UniProtKB/Swiss-Prot annotation:
Annotated glycosylation sites: 235, 246
GO molecular function per UniProt: potassium:chloride symporter activity
Name of the protein in question: Solute carrier family 12 member 9
Membrane side Cytoplasmic: residue ranges: 1-44, 102-127, 198-202, 288-304, 369-393, 441-469, 761-899
Location relative to the cell: Cell membrane; Lysosome membrane
Domain of life: Eukaryota
Keyword Glycosyltransferase: no
One BP term from GO: potassium ion homeostasis
Membrane topology according to the record: Multi-pass membrane protein
Length: 899
């Protein structure tokens, strides 16, 4: 499976068009599962036939002939022009975004859905794509119902006029649904033949429509004033007046005068009228939806869409102005088909109405089917859209056409054009906002590969397009707008939880990178302050199979800080054909996902583990985010447990996060080597291990040694566990007289324990601090203990650390202490095993079985490397059998008592 790291394009080194220079088994180039080969192409449409013609016809639709009077009659010329301007500003802003995205790479079938999904990712793309598809479905229903309305307006039976033989078609809800179904069936038949026959039919209709528009303009100038009889059924009759070019008529038509819509009986307002008018501008995606049939979609979509928008804007503008100059309010508001009554030859307008409505219906039906087919191919909705994958031998997605036809049939049940116009407008607006959002995201991400050839846009136009679309959604119909957003969120969640990772690229990653880089540059290490210190941890991992418990525990220890998993592969790059580390990253990242830890991964290749650790200590991190604390597993002879065999997360088929970016549980099991056999020679010697501790201290890193963590019972899985304490021993148990309770290392120890106690899963545990006090045989032994406890309690209060204080009598242990000389401990002298065992017994006895994890003071390793093994043996004796234990040595001040 491809992943996000896959290249965007796969280049072939051989030509496939030069007559045989390529290899005989040349296969088509594959990009995002779309084949771009040398066989016969299905891309046949040019800019004019594939974009300009369908876009113009879709934007005109029924509105240009049947709703001009509706808009001007209710809103007046001034508000009509305002509506036109607002609508085209929104349209134009979206067109700029469409042009930018479509000229930034090859556009495949699916149009707007393809552009959104390949920019914003599958969740957002699939959600908006489905809603844009539904918008086209509803729009198709609007256009078909508009055509039925126009037919019945002329040929519908009128009981009050039995002498008119033309008006013979029965009227009523059932008959309207029947007529609409017949028209829709005709549209489906044309779309089933294919895009080629559709483009030919559209061009013929295009010519026809412009001839009709020309006759309308001529009629405005040539027809003399007349009175028009208006009938709404029954015996209701009224008259409207066509005055010709008249300034008084213009004056009367300037202001708005909203009244009842005679088709629905609802009172009109600015929002409802704008919804109907805007529906006549929403066809800008008609050419984009046919991107799979265009010869050069990246060139045709921007050029053709811009030309179509300019043409329709001026046609609407001219019609609004001439209508306001020539027709009175009654004619405009009571007869939406008044163009026919004032035309030099009335049948011309009928032809135009029927042609545009039929063309818009076909355009939205075929466009919706292409969107649905693209959605089905991407398999975002599973078996629900499986029938839409069916295609003919010629590549026509007939399954998607039939599927869409069935949904439009359901829309036709609404019965009235204006009833569903608001739904169409809201769905189109949310799709336009998504297009603008996609372009805005690309612009803000500043990705080097976003360099569209169309440059007449900016983030300002994208943002303005988003805001204007969202505002108009709620102005048109708050209920529909709210419902559409709820639907969008539901679809987002559905696709997110059921879809697997895609190879389309994630714009979120580009945006995150852009923001992280910006803030990393602002993160200045020179401004660090102890008040805002946080752990930035590098955990060195030999094999995740044996370290998973520790990886999870350190995740609780980071407290919002940096957490990096470091690993050293031993080897010499000079002897290898390629760097093996590069292929390992995906497995380590999947491990991080499986364990649900917030960690980065850093791998390196070195001849030795010690050298690799030095490299990671130096170069891991970036800017102000570099590790200040190193965690190492303890070096002992214990037989490591294979955690992968115990946790269901790593059992194939049982993990809820299986198959993340192509790495499933089986792959993880196979990638990481088995747990080390006790008889197998180790890659790291005891001497090198202690030297790594020295290296970390020399680099001014705090050091933590973790032992016995396979025995750790995690808090969330142990509600009934008796372990309820986090124990802290802030004194160097190996050399008590060489340290103090308030030195930097002791305070660091307290800070780390406090951080663990602040983690959500560890809050129910009680922090417990042990003070080792000797009576020294004096008479004031008890008072000395009390004074030591009071002094330490005051320190904890200043540090705002809540903890129990336990005073431990250290006299018995001190009796086994190594030789003292003048109060100085002789580091070269070995510490007796009796003392170490006595100290361990004291730690065990005082803590009991209720201790979950212990924090102990880690003394510095001896400077003499010959003593390193003895140093490790002392630590081994002290901590053997203690349970989960952290040995910590801190170098940096991390506590503050002031505000």
């Amino acid at each position: 499976m491809t992943s996000e790291s896959s290249p965007l394009l796969h280049y072939r080194l051989f030509s496939v068009s030069d007559g045989g220079l390529g290899p005989p088994d040349s296969s088509p180039i594959m990009t995002d599962a779309v084949t771009v080969g040398t066989g016969p192409t299905q891309r046949k449409l040019s800019t004019f036939f594939g974009v300009v013609v369908p876009t113009v016809l879709s934007m005109f639709s029924i509105v240009v002939f049947m709703r001009i009077g509706f808009v001007v009659g209710h809103a007046g010329l001034l508000q009509s022009l305002l509506m036109l301007f607002v609508a085209y500003v929104i349209i134009w802003l979206t067109v700029l975004s469409v042009c930018a995205i479509s000229t930034n790479g090859a556009v495949q079938g699916g149009g707007a859905y393809f552009m959104i999904s390949r920019t914003l990712g599958p969740e957002f793309g699939g959600s908006i794509g489905l809603m844009f598809y539904l918008a086209n479905v509803f729009a198709c229903g609007v256009y078909v119902l508009g055509l039925v309305e126009a037919v019945l307006d002329v040929f519908g039976r009128d009981p009050s006029d039995v002498t008119d033989s033309l008006r013979s078609l029965p009227q009523g809800y059932g008959y309207s649904f029947l007529y609409a179904s017949i028209i829709l069936l005709l549209c489906m038949a044309i779309c089933l033949v294919g895009a080629s026959i559709y483009s030919q039919a559209s061009f013929f209709i295009f010519l026809l429509v412009f001839v009709v528009l020309l006759t309308i303009l001529i009629s405005f100038l040539a027809v003399r004033p007349l009175t028009v009889s208006i009938r709404h059924g029954g015996n209701v009759t009224m008259t409207g007046v066509y005055t010709g070019i008249n300034s008084s008529t213009l004056h009367n038509n300037l202001q708005a005068d909203y009244s009842l819509d005679y088709t629905t009986g609802n009172l009109m307002n600015f929002a409802t009228v704008f919804a109907v008018m805007f529906n006549g501008c929403t066809g800008i995606m008609a050419g984009c939806n046919l991107s799979g049939e265009l010869k050069q979609p990246s060139r045709s979509i921007p050029m053709g869409t811009i030309i179509a928008v300019i043409i329709t804007f001026f046609v609407y503008l001219i019609l609004f102005i001439f209508t306001a100059f020539t027709c009175d309010r009654t004619l405009l508001r009571e007869d939406y088909g008044f163009f026919r009554s004032i035309n030099i030859w009335p049948p011309f307008v009928l032809i135009g109405v029927y042609a545009t409505s039929l063309s818009a219906s076909m355009s939205t039906l075929i466009g919706a089917s292409r969107i649905l087919h693209a959605l089905a191919k991407d398999d975002l909705f599973g078996v629900l859209l499986a029938p839409a994958k069916l295609v003919s031998k010629g590549g026509n997605p007939w399954g998607a056409v039939v599927y869409t036809w069935a949904l439009v049939q359901l829309v036709l049940l609404a019965g009235k054009l204006n009833t569903i116009a608001g739904i169409v407008t809201v769905f189109y607006l949310i799709a336009y906002a998504a297009i603008d959002l996609a372009c805005l995201a690309l612009e803000w991400a500043s990705a080097p590969n976003f360099r569209p050839t169309f440059r007449f846009f900016s983030w300002h136009t994208c943002l303005l397009g988003i805001l204007s679309s969202l505002v108009m959604m709620f102005l048109i119909n708050p209920a529909y707008a709210s419902g559409s957003i709820v639907l969008l969120l539901l679809l987002l969640g559905s696709i997110h939880f059921r879809s697997s990772s895609s190879s389309w690229g994630y714009i979120s990653q580009a945006l995150i990178f852009h923001q992280v880089r910006k803030y990393l540059l602002l993160l200045d290490v020179r401004k660090d302050h102890v008040k805002f210190w946080r752990p930035q941890i590098l955990l060195m991992v030999s094999n995740p199979r044996t370290s998973s418990q520790l990886i999870r525990f350190v995740n609780d220890l980071k407290k919002g800080g940096l957490y990096i998993l470091g690993h050293v592969e031993t080897g010499d790059l000079d002897t290898l054909p390629s760097d093996p580390v590069q292929t390992h990253y995906s497995f380590w990242l999947s491990l991080v996902d499986k364990l649900n830890v917030k960690a980065f991964v850093d791998l390196t290749l070195c001849p030795s583990v010690r050298q690799g650790t030095q490299h990671l200590l130096r170069i891991t991190g970036l800017g102000g985010m570099k590790p200040n604390t190193v965690v190492l597993g303890f070096y002992d002879d214990a037989c490591p447990d294979d955690y992968f065999l115990q946790d269901s997360l790593f059992t194939p088929g049982l993990s809820p996060k299986d198959d993340a970016f192509g790495v499933d549980a089986t792959s993880l099991q196979a990638h990481f080597p088995p747990a080390r056999d006790p008889e197998t020679p180790r890659l790291l010697s005891a001497k090198d291990y202690v030297s790594m501790i020295c290296d970390a201290l020399k680099m001014h890193k705090n050091i933590v040694l973790a032992r016995n963590f396979p025995l750790l019972v995690r808090p969330e899985a142990s509600s009934s566990s008796p372990a309820t304490y986090i124990d802290v021993w802030p004194l160097d148990l190996l050399r008590p007289q060489a340290s103090a309770y308030v030195d930097v290392c002791s305070l660091f120890l307290l800070q780390m324990a406090c951080i663990l106690n602040m983690a959500a899963s560890w809050r129910r545990y009680q922090l417990r601090v042990f003070l080792c006090v000797e009576s020294r045989g004096g008479s004031d032994g008890a008072s000395g203990w009390l004074a030591a406890e009071a002094k330490f309690r005051e320190l904890l209060s200043k540090l705002r650390i809540r903890a129990l204080i336990r005073v431990v009598a250290w006299d018995r242990v001190a009796a086994f202490r190594v030789q003292n000389m003048g109060g100085q401990v002789l580091n070269r002298e070995p510490i007796s095993s009796e003392y170490l065992n006595a100290a361990k017994s004291a730690v065990t006895d005082e803590g009991g079985t209720e201790t979950a994890v212990r924090f102990l003071y880690l003394p510095r390793p001896p400077a003499d490397s010959s003593l390193h093994e003895r140093y490790l043996e002392e630590l081994d004796t002290l901590t053997s059998g203690l349970g989960p234990t952290l040995l910590i040595h801190g170098l940096t001040p991390v506590t503050c008592t002031e505000l």
